Amino acid sequence: MAAILGKKIGMTRIYNEKREAVPCTVIQAAPCFVSQVKTSDNDGYEAYQLSIGERKEAKVSKPMRGHYAKAGITPGYKIAEFGKDLMDADLELGSSVSVDMFKEGDKVDVRGVTKGKGFAGVVKRHNFAGGSRTHGQSDRLRAPGSVGGSSDPSRTFKGMRMAGRMGSKNVKVRGLQIVKIIPESNLLVIKGSVPGVKNSYVEIVTRNK
């Protein structure tokens, strides 16, 4: 088992032994450092808190500066917790974590925040077909249609699919394959797409089933 934080660099393609183009996402998975070790005695559960990147102290709040100083590391851009059961190695406070714990062919789950699309209508947000394009229709082309009865039930049911803000959701994509590891640059090349925009941060965890 292994877990790490990474920064999404972008997408590319590689060619396999069958000369097929495979779309891949490149993730910069270091430098990561252990910013806190949580124990069952002190915190009620066991986990490692990882920090990624190096940030100017002036950009970090005073409480977080003290938090990083306790670990003896420079402030990072993002922190995330991973249960100790997700790590094969025993990590110490302030130690570094790299892509060496992964191997090519591993299946991983990747969690990130999807791209924000802003306020979107039902056709874009929920794939509605829209209204009729003929028979005198003038302004119902991308409208949602009826959202409830009149006297019965006299209300709109909870969960009705409507227009609203689209994207910017926490999403986990399961079962992606690591096709290449470049340890000298701490890069993971993962088959397929992962959530988020370029330069956003993602959590990568090996599959446990």
Curated annotation (Swiss-Prot):
Q: Residues annotated as region Disordered?
A: 128-156
InterPro entries reported in the protein's UniProt record: Ribosomal_uL3 (IPR000597), Ribosomal_uL3_bac/org-type (IPR019927), Ribosomal_uL3_CS (IPR019926), Transl_B-barrel_sf (IPR009000)
Cysteine pairs bridged by disulfides in the record: none
Kindly list the biological process annotations in GO that this record carries.
Answer: translation
Alphabetical GO CC annotations of the entry are: cytosolic large ribosomal subunit
One of the record's GO molecular function terms: structural constituent of ribosome
The cross-references to Gene3D superfamilies, in alphabetical order and at most eight, read: 3.30.160.810, Translation factors
Keyword terms = Ribonucleoprotein, Ribosomal protein, RNA-binding, rRNA-binding
Query: Which PANTHER family does the record cross-reference, listed alphabetically?
Result: 50S RIBOSOMAL PROTEIN L3, LARGE RIBOSOMAL SUBUNIT PROTEIN UL3C
Family that this chain belongs to? Belongs to the universal ribosomal protein uL3 family.
Q: How does it assemble?
A: Part of the 50S ribosomal subunit. Forms a cluster with proteins L14 and L19.
Query: What job does this protein perform?
Result: One of the primary rRNA binding proteins, it binds directly near the 3'-end of the 23S rRNA, where it nucleates assembly of the 50S subunit.
Q: What is this protein called?
A: Large ribosomal subunit protein uL3
